[in-house]
Structures are given as structure tokens and as C-alpha cells.
Amino acid sequence: MALLRKINQVLLFLLIVTLCVILYKKVHKGTVSKNDADDESETPEELEEEIPVVICAAAGRMGATMAAINSIYSNTDANILFYVVGLRNTLTRIRKWIEHSKLREINFKIVEFNPMVLKGKIRPDSSRPELLQPLNFVRFYLPLLIHQHEKVIYLDDDVIVQGDIHELYDTTLALGHAAAFSDDCDLPSAQDINRLVGLQNTYMGYLDYRKKAIKDLGISPSTCSFNPGVIVANMTEWKHQHITKQLEKWMQKNVEENLYSSSLGGGVATSPMLIVFHGKYSTINPLWHIRHLGWNPDARYSEHFLQEAKLLHWNGRHKPWDFPSVHNDLWESWFVPDPAGIFKLNHHS
């Protein structure tokens, strides 16, 4: 009898323990579910779409980068993450410029670019040596520098953004396209200024059609070129199509065979992109890349046209922080003074 009573006590104890465990799990699960529900309810605000913008900051023209960033940040309410790319010896200066100026509120990451990846891929001779600067080729290596984003915007440093960058980010890329660019034949006003300053806007202006490797591509020399100073890129497609490796292949072929020259279209970075992306890119709204402002200090766009433009690009020799240049007032309104006093404007001869 005593044994039976003891067994019943043990069973009762086990039953109580089991009930306690079940009750604990239910309460704990309810708490976790509630937290999950809270997280889900907060997701739309907390996980607002992040727009990655990649821009380079070269030592001698860092003021250009900061002006571009200022113009982007000031003209949008979107959640922008700036990837500011520089060489190792400039990284500290980049951070100080941002953190000790009006740009301190921006969301940014500083990325180091190792120029050793370019070894053996660039011809040393050039009529425009500034185009051989390592950072000019950062756009070739976007997936190696930026990892967690599906879609990325790349901008040259000599641009000013007057529109909401979210509009550019919303550019539709066709299925199978790794990037979107702006065609060089896409605006009547652009064509007018092309004639005025003698610019090339076809493949003939960038590639040496006397060379067999170029002829074998089967690309008509009259094909309209595009400008890779503004890029909307799909990182998944870029990696899937091995775009970086294709670009490197043509860089190496150029070293061996001199297939394109900076003396043609001034495009040592543009030319391989024209080859690799021929017939396989989407287009950007022309107003999001109004360019050639730096080609001729005597060639000007109309004020009305400039006001309509979403993005201005001073590609060419005549930069808006230097003399001579055109429409530099539009650029200077976004200039962020260098806290270190190194970068200075030069608007007088």
C-alpha cells in the first residue's frame, strides 16, 4: 500500500512537471510570436529600400565627389547608402571630409580599391593620362566591391544630380541585361552640342577598325555609342554573365594589340564596355545624363534645358571647379568646402 502511494506521488510529480513545461513553452512561444509580429509590423519603415550609390574619390579631385554626394543627398528623401571608393592613401581624408562637413549626416561606407588588379591590363601611353587613373576602372569591378545589393547606381565624380535619385534607381533593366546606360544619340540637344564641339558619338570614335579583332566583332562603326559615366547595374546578371572577366579580357587584348586609344574618343574605360555590352544593355532616361559640359568652354546648353536636366555631367577636360569651364555656377552651388583646406576652386586664369 505504501509502495502504491509512493508510485502515485511520483506520477503526480511528473504530471505537474510536464504541465509546467507545456505551460512554459506556450507562454514562451506566444512571446516570440508577438515579437515576430511586432518586427513584421515595423518592417516597412525599418527596412525602407536602400539605394546604393557608388562614386569614386580621387586625391586631386575629391571636392568633385563631395559636391556630387551633396547634390544627391539634398534632392531626395530616399534611403541612400553611398559607397565612396578610394585608394588606400586617401581613405582617412575621405572620412574626415565627410565627418567634418555638412555631409556628416549621410549614410556611407568607404571602400578601398586595390590598383594591383589592373596590373598588365592598361597600356601606359595615353594622350590623356588622367584617364589611366586606377579609380577610372572601378566600374568594371562593382560586384567585387559591393556585395549585398541586387541593383546599384554608379556615378562618375564630375556630376551633379538635380533630380530625385530614386527615379534613376527605378530604371527598368530588360531581362538578361546587366546594366543600363544613356545612348550618345538620344537627345536632339546632345546631338547639337556634339556637332558644335566635334565629339564622336559612334563606335568609330572609340575603336580602331583597322584592327582584325575589332573587325571580327561585326559591329558597325556607325553604331551609336553610350557613356558609362552613369550606370544602373544588376549585380546578379553582371556576375552571371562574367562581365568583369569579359572587360578584363578586352583590356588585356588592348595592351597586346592597341585596339582602342584615348586619342580617339578619350575612352580607355569606355571602349571595352562598348564591346562587352554591345546590343545587351537597357537605356536610361536621357534627362538623367546630360553630358559633354566639360568638352569645350565655349559650348553652352540653354538655361531652360539645364533646368530640365536631372543629372549634369562635366565629362571632358574642362571641369567646373577649374578654369576655363562652363555652367560652373550650377556645380559650385553644391560644393562642400574642404575642412583640410587642400581642395580649392580655381575659376580665374
Curated annotation (Swiss-Prot):
Glycosylation sites recorded in the entry for this protein: N234
Localisation: Membrane
Topology with respect to the bilayer: Single-pass type II membrane protein
UniProt-listed Pfam families: Glyco_transf_8
Record topological domains on the Cytoplasmic side: 1-6
Keyword Glycosyltransferase: yes
Keyword Magnesium: no
Disulfide-bond pairs as recorded: none
Membrane-side (Lumenal) residue stretches: 25-349
Listed name of the protein: Glycosyltransferase 8 domain-containing protein 2
E.C. code: 2.4.1.-
Annotated GO CC locations: Golgi apparatus; membrane
Superkingdom, taxonomy of origin: Eukaryota
Keyword terms of this UniProt record: Glycoprotein, Glycosyltransferase, Membrane, Signal-anchor, Transferase, Transmembrane, Transmembrane helix
Molecular function (Gene Ontology), one example: UDP-glycosyltransferase activity
Annotated TM spans: 7-24
